[in-house]
Amino acid sequence: MAKHLYKTPIPSTRKGTVDRQVKSNPRNKLIHGRHRCGKGRNARGIITARHRGGGHKRLYRKIDFRRNQKDISGRIVTIEYDPNRNAYICLIHYGDGEKRYILHPRGAIIGDTIVSGTKVPISMGNALTDMPLGTAIHNIEITRGRGGQLARAAGAVAKLIAKEGKLATLRLPSGEVRLVSQNCLATVGQVGNVGVNQKSLGRAGSKCWLGKRPVVRGVVMNPVDHPHGGGEGKAPIGRKKPTTPWGYPALGRRTRKRKKYSDSFILRRRK
């Protein structure tokens, strides 16, 4: 990511960075309005996901996660910013006149050609099922035809490490090793915008535009609001171990549902 550092005497933008190479110019037929329900609230209006709310209005870009334009080559026309995800997106013009958005593969530039199918070259941006061991992939399907569901965030990449029978073994970005069907599609390469974690927003207002509310420590709250709250001055939490706002252990507690149907496909849990 080509970062531009603001050079200004104003404290709010003194250390902010912005990517000048990527702009937003969405196509009307590939976007639609989307109501952001609740923003962290449930149907009763109670907060279920903390630190969410506000944010700028967004138009949803229809992303082609299925890559079902088989054996039809397409050309990358633009690389655009998407407010709904960290990764950038590409506008593809296919040979039959179809236009679609896909996730931007790292290193892809305007003018590159991509294609999806069963017997296509193993090159960056192509979507296929059969590929050699050690291939870096992203946008991986779990169920054939449902579309990519794994490794879709900015900079995400998985690795194909084994094949046996009808199943393939993948190492995911989280460190998890799991099995998927060899009939599932995946896209070759890594998702672009790798340096998203090095981006500096520069001020609190920029984070509010993203729909993220301030995070307050529990130790500075009142006892009625958090188990860590209360005391005189800078008092400790008063417990042996940190807890969540609802009193459960905060560090190391497993939150995955027991006896989940996909447990048999996970060979090693995430780190």
UniProtKB/Swiss-Prot annotation:
Cellular localization per UniProt: Plastid, Chloroplast
The protein's matches in Pfam families, at most eight in alphabetical order, are given as: Ribosomal_L2, Ribosomal_L2_C
Is Chaperone one of the keywords UniProt gives this record? Answer: no
Mostly located where? plastid
Q: Which GO terms describe its molecular function?
A: RNA binding; rRNA binding; structural constituent of ribosome; transferase activity
Output the Gene3D superfamilies linked to this UniProt entry: 2.30.30.30, Nucleic acid-binding proteins (2.40.50.140), Ribosomal protein L2, domain 3 (4.10.950.10)
The protein's matches in InterPro entries, at most eight in alphabetical order, are given as: NA-bd_OB-fold (IPR012340), Rib_uL2_dom2 (IPR014722), Ribosomal_uL2 (IPR002171), Ribosomal_uL2_bac/org-type (IPR005880), Ribosomal_uL2_C (IPR022669), Ribosomal_uL2_CS (IPR022671), Ribosomal_uL2_dom3 (IPR014726), Ribosomal_uL2_RNA-bd_dom (IPR022666)
Q: Where is the stretch described as Disordered?
A: 1-22, 223-271
Identify the GO cellular component terms for this protein.
chloroplast; mitochondrial large ribosomal subunit
What Gene Ontology biological process does one annotation of this record name? mitochondrial translation
What's in the keyword line of the UniProt record? Chloroplast, Plastid, Ribonucleoprotein, Ribosomal protein
Stored HAMAP family: Ribosomal_uL2_B
Matches recorded under PANTHER family: LARGE RIBOSOMAL SUBUNIT PROTEIN UL2CZ_UL2CY, RIBOSOMAL PROTEIN L2
Family (UniProt): Belongs to the universal ribosomal protein uL2 family.
Assembly mode? Part of the 50S ribosomal subunit.
Q: NCBIfam families from the entry?
A: rplB_bact (TIGR01171)
What is this protein called in UniProt? Large ribosomal subunit protein uL2cz/uL2cy
